[in-house]
Amino acid sequence: LMTSGEVRAGIVTGSSQVLCHTDRIAGFCDRISACYPRIRVIAEIENSDDDFESYDKTRALLSAHPDINALYFTAAGVYGGCRAVLSLNRTDIHILAYDKIPATKELMEQHIISAVICQQPAIQGSKPIQLLFDYLTAGEAPDREFYYTAVDIRILENL
């Protein structure tokens, strides 16, 4: 969908200490090793979910590995990382990120991000707090063990 030929990917994550970040990387790597032999992960960096750090580290990553032609952002810091791509005039890089938030939407409209994986971050953030509040203030236990959010992939055409 996003690239043709050999794909040399860089992974930009928030922290190796955050389970959802490491799970995303593991799932990505497992899937590409099983099904997509033309995709190779070149390097992985951590940006502490910070746009300024992401800018510096993504710029250094791309300078050290000019053969990278795809970036997979597993956490925050996408805006800073994309600014690094732009600062190097790397229009050949395809970018995959998470969550349709104003920054990623803007970057998609500017044709910088190719696709985002949406997972309803507002619900993910507010639902646990609401459940905990209801339990602590009213003694209402959650009505089920797991709450799932919808996951979909957005490209410019279905943004």
Where is each model-derived feature located?
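Hydrophobic alpha-helical segments within soluble ligand-binding/sensing domains
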Residues: 1-8, 54-55, 104, 120-137
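Short, structured loop/turn "capping" segments at alpha-beta junctions
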Residues: 3-9, 35-43, 68
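Short beta-strand segments enriched in small/hydrophobic residues
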Residues: 8-17
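Short hydrophobic segments within beta-strands
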Residues: 12, 72-73, 154
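Hinge/cleft segment of the Venus flytrap/periplasmic-binding protein
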Residues: 16, 120-159
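Short, solvent-exposed amphipathic alpha-helices that sit
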Residues: 19-38, 57, 80-81, 124
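Hydrophobic alpha-helical
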Residues: 28, 43-103
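Glycine-rich, charge-decorated loop segments at or immediately adjacent to ligand/cofactor-binding or catalytic sites
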Residues: 102-113
